[in-house]
Amino acid sequence: MTDDIRLRVVNPNTTRAMTDLIGRSARVVAGPGVRVDAVQPTTGPASVESHYEEALAAVGVLEQVRLGEADGVDAYVVACFGDPGLDAARELARGPVLGIAEAAFHAATMVARRFTVVTSLGRTVGRAHELLDRYGFADACAGVHACEIPVLALEDPASGALERVTAACRAAVEADDVDAVVLGCAGMAAFTGQISAAVGVPVVDGVSAATTFAAALVRAGLRTSSRGEYAAPPAKPVTGMLAGFAIGSAPSPAAVPTA
C-alpha cells in the first residue's frame, strides 16, 4: 500500500484536552504511513461515566464515523472503554472499527495468561464485566478494580491520578495474582509506561492496542464483513432531532478535529 492509512480516533466525549491526549497516544504507536485524525463529537457529555452518558456518546461516535466515511477514512478507533456505538459504527464504515476495550483484552492475552482490569469509577465495573463476557475474555480476566478517580480528574496533576492508578494496579496484580494489567479508561493512556515500570508487568492501554490493530487490519486488506449483522442499515425515515442520521442523508460537516 503506497498511500497513507487514514485512521480516525474518535473520543466519544466532548472534552478537547482528552481528545488531544488520546490523539498523542495513538500517534506514538501509529508509525510511518498512518495519519491519525483525533476527533470528538460536536455534542455530547463531557465524560462518559454512566449508561446514560454512554448512550448519548454513541450518537456522537456515529456522527464522526459518517463524516469519516464521506472523507475517505480507512479505519476507526472508538476511544472509550465502554466501546459505545461500536456495533452501529461497524454497520456504517467501509473499513475496520475497533473499540479500545476489545482491543485491550486481545492484547493482554497475547502477553499474559491472565490479566486484571483497573478502571476509573466503581459504577463502571459492571460494564467492564459485561464486555469481558461478550468478547469472550471473562475466563482470562481475574478481576476488575476501580481506582475511584473521575475521568476528567485523570488529567489534573493536582488529583494525584498517576500515583493513585499505579497503586491500584499494584494492588490488583498482587490480589489477583496476574501477569498483566488492562487500563480501563482512555484517559489513562499517558500512564502506561510509568505504571508498567513501577508494577513490573505489561500494562495495556486500549488506545495504543486499537490503533496498532486497526492499522494492521487495513494493511492486511481486512475489513468488517458486510454480510449479516454488520450489513448496512436499511434506508428508512428518521424524524426529529436525529433526522440528519437517516441513511442516505448528507452528514453534517461540523467535525471537531484536533490540531
Give residue spans per PLM region.
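Short, well-structured alpha-helical segments in soluble
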Residues: 55-72, 163-177
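N-terminal beta-loop-helix "entrance" segment that forms/cooperates
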Residues: 38-63, 152-157
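Periplasmic-binding protein-like
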Residues: 9, 70-80, 177-185
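Short, glycine-/small-residue-rich phosphate/pyrophosphate-handling segment
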Residues: 17, 109-147, 160-163, 216-259
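N-terminal beta1-alpha1 ligand-phosphate binding loop
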Residues: 5-29
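Glycine/small-residue-rich loop that forms an oxyanion/phosphate-binding "nest" at active or ligand-binding sites
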Residues: 58-113, 117
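Short hydrophobic/aromatic-enriched beta-strand-loop microsegments
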Residues: 95-102, 137-144, 201-208
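Active-site rim beta-loop-alpha module in soluble metabolic enzymes
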Residues: 129-185, 191
